[in-house]
Design a protein with these regions (language model features):
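A transmembrane-helix-recognition feature enriched in membrane-embedded lipid enzymes
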Residues: 1-44, 94-99
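Soluble catalytic domains of membrane acyltransferases
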Residues: 37-147
């Protein structure tokens, strides 16, 4: 897994600045799918499967594990909204920034307007936004219902 992470750092640092968004998206999706394979995780959708080809999609989900982000990106390219503190995390914060994560400073109420504008721009251009409204991960036993 460490080699897979190193591969991502090298590709993003050396190639991403010169690649089209479409090509970067394909690389990200393949990397995420390979990560699921390395971890022996199989994606299974139960119930009514959503049409993931739809443009302008917002995914709203509970956040059980750090794997949620990679699993969703293995199925469909997603730009996530994350707390600004993640940006300063070693390696993962840099990768999140370089792959288009929107960071929000939850201590500054006015930052919501900035992030909302960025989300609108992404959605209006056909992108997909992912949010975890609980704002944290949990073991899943105390998940709160959506209303």
């Amino acid at each position: 897994m460490a080699l897979h992470l190193l591969y991502a750092v090298v590709i993003i640092a050396l190639l991403f600045p010169w690649l089209s968004e479409n090509f970067r998206t394909r690389i990200e999706r393949r990397w995420n799918r390979n990560l699921m394979g390395i971890l022996n995780i199989k994606v299974r959708i139960s119930g009514a499967a959503p049409d993931l080809s739809v443009q302008n999609m917002m995914l709203v989900s509970n956040h059980i594990s750090w794997l949620d982000i990679y699993l969703l990106n293995a199925v469909r390219p997603v730009r996530f909204v994350s707390k600004v503190e993640v940006r300063s995390w070693p390696v993962v914060g840099w990768l999140a920034h370089k792959t288009g994560t929107l960071f929000i400073d939850r201590t500054k109420r006015h930052d919501t307007a900035r992030v909302n504008n960025e989300m609108a721009t992404i959605l209006n251009s056909g992108g997909c936004i992912g949010v975890f409204p609980e704002g944290t991960t949990s073991n899943g036993s105390l998940l709160k219902p959506f209303h």
